[in-house]
């Protein structure tokens, strides 16, 4: 499935919900070919848009969910977090997905009331690169300061002393670095730039952090798949991608120095989980980053993808369908996170449950489970 990333820019998710007034959604045990059969007479169509970061997992969810449920259809557009937030606020979709939480200013634009952030998965942002002289089995090592200087355009060649200092014995060519960054509003960019701002005063006082920034150098590409393609096809390029994209496209990726500078950590489900499990201070609205997390084995560039939903739903059928899909995704759906994403920690799942249970369909709770 991950090998199909570039072909699933727009994933159609056949979700299924047995429509009964008493229970909202009940499993039918039917396959996708019988999801609209006699036992499931009603159909609720939902639409979502946003994060490319989560798209490989969302596609996997679609396959599994349609096999176990029946009745509703959900389409998901992998357009980037920024575009997803825009569509969500314009109410042209029923839910959004973003890797950077909405800002206070964005939430203030909501014409449909309170917005809920529901963490759906956790992933790592890998530093992708294309340096032919470096063996594919080698993960080049980068400090946070070195990465900031590369993306600032201050380190210009691959054999720069700052890179060489962390990669003793590696054949680093005297070739110019081509930085590849996102051209669209991107939650993946949000995670990376929050990390760079945390480790570099030059970055925090310069480009800063956000889904869209003024990049000091480099070329832009749209979506995680666009950056992956650009890096793969450009010798001596460096970029950043959700881990699933570099693995699916056989792109080399680096190890990043951990917070206490005791080692260089390769992104994986284990090292991203270590970062996520180090989080103890969780705000009530679940809007936070955990970049540069403590822990010897914590990969420092990791973050959530959130589902965005409105707390007060005006269409009871859609509200129930959204709530039930969100519940499934944050519970049964977590088993499909491995190997390139991380299952949500129990403390986050508990907070997700409270968010979903707070959704109202008129005077009743949307979630009936």
Q: What are these model-derived regions, one by one?
A:
Residues 22-27:
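C-terminal motif of bacterial Sec signal peptides marking the signal peptidase cleavage site
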Residues 9-19:
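Sec-dependent N-terminal signal peptides
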Residues 2-6, 11, 29-369:
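Flexible loop/hinge segments at secondary-structure junctions
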């Amino acid at each position: 499935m991950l090998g199909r990333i570039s072909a699933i820019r727009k994933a159609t998710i056949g979700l299924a919900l047995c429509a009964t007034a008493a229970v909202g959604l009940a499993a039918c045990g039917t396959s996708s070919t019988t999801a609209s059969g006699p036992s499931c007479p009603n159909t609720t169509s939902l639409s979502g848009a946003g994060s490319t970061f989560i798209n490989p997992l969302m596609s996997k969810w679609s396959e599994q969910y349609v096999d176990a449920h029946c009745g509703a259809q959900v389409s998901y557009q992998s357009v980037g977090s920024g575009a997803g937030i825009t569509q969500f606020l314009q109410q042209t979709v029923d839910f959004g997905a973003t890797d950077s939480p909405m800002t206070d200013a964005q939430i203030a634009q909501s014409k449909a009331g309170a917005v809920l952030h529901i963490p759906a998965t956790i992933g790592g942002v890998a530093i992708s690169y294309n340096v032919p002289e470096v063996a594919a089995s080698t993960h080049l090592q980068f400090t946070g300061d070195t990465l900031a200087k590369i993306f600032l355009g201050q380190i210009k060649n691959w054999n720069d002393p700052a890179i060489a200092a962390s990669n003793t014995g590696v054949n680093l060519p005297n070739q110019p670095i081509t930085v590849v960054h996102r051209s669209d509003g991107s939650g993946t960019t949000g995670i990376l730039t929050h990390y760079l701002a945390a480790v570099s005063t030059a970055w925090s006082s310069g480009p800063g952090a956000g889904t869209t920034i003024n990049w000091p150098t480099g070329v832009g590409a749209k979506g995680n798949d666009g950056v992956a393609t650009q890096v793969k096809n450009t010798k001596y390029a460096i970029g950043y991608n959700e881990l699933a994209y570099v693995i699916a496209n056989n792109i080399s990726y680096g190890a990043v120095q951990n917070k206490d500078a005791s080692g260089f950590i390769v992104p994986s489900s284990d090292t991203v989980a270590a970062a996520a499990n180090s989080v103890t201070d969780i705000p009530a609205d679940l809007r936070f980053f955990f970049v540069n997390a403590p822990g010897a084995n914590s990969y420092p560039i990791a973050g959530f993808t959130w589902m965005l939903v409105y707390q007060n739903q005006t269409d009871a059928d859609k509200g129930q369908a959204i709530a039930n899909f969100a519940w499934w995704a944050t519970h049964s759906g977590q088993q499909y996170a491995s190997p390139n994403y991380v299952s949500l920690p129990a403390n986050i799942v508990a907070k997700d449950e409270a968010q979903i249970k707070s959704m109202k369909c008129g005077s009743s709770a949307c979630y009936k489970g």
